[in-house]
C-alpha cells in the first residue's frame, strides 16, 4: 500500500472543516449538509470503494447508507470492548451508549467489515449478530521499528539509572484501564517466591496519572513487593525499544484484547512472553508464550514462576519468533 501511495498519479488528500469540535457532526440538523459534502466528494472523485479506518473513533462521521449509492463501503473494527463490557465503559460518558450503538447500526449496512483477529470476528457474530460472511480477518502486525538491537553498555546504564532498574526485569506495557490487569499482575508478582522477587523487578511501562502510580505502589507494598515494582510513566519510542531488548520476560496478562501488540513487539525484540489464554491473545501467543488465566492471580503467579525458573525461555522464544512471521505486514 505504501509503495502504491508513493507511485499513484491520482492520489490526493481532501480535508473538510466541520466546525470547532466537529460540531456539525454532533447535531442531526446539519446532516443534510454533511451528506451533500460526502456525496459530492464521492462523485467528483469517482470513488468505487470507501474505507472507514476507525468507525468507533469519536471524530468519525456517522455516515448514512443513502449517501453511498453505487459505492462499496468497507470498515475496520479493532475490537468491541465497550459493547462487551457495557457496565464498565458506558457509565464513563453520558452519551456513550447512544454514541456506540449508533455506530453499530452504521456497521450493519456497510458491505464488508475487516477485523484484526478471529476473536473479534467471533465476538461480533456472538454479541452483535453479524453474519460471518460479512466479516474478514486481516491480522494486525508488528511495526518494523521493533527489532533486536545491540544496546551499548553506556546506554543500558543510562536507561537503568533513569528508571531505577537495578536487576533483571519483567516488562509490562499496558495502562491504567482495569482491563489491562496491572493490579492482578502486581499481586501475582508479589506472590512469587522471595528468591525470585529478589532476582527480578517488575517494570510497568506506560503513561499513568500520579494517582494511578500511587495506587500501584500502594498495592505493591500490600502485595509483599515493596521496592520491586517500577512505573516508568511515559517513555520515548527509543526507550521502549531498549527496554524491550533488555527485559528478561514480557508479562501481558490482559483480560481482553482485540489483537495484542505487546506480544508480537516483544518477540520482535527477542523477549519471551507470558500472556493470557483468552480473546485474541491465545490466538497470537499460541505455543510461543506461557499462557495464564488473567482472572486468576494464582495462575498468573504460576505462569511467572514457570517462565522464570522452569521453562526453557530460549526454546519458547524461538517458537514465538516462528509465530511472529505470520504477523508481519508483508504477510498480512
Functional labels for PLM-detected ranges:
Residues 1-332:
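Carbohydrate transferase catalytic cores enriched for Leloir-type hexosyltransferases
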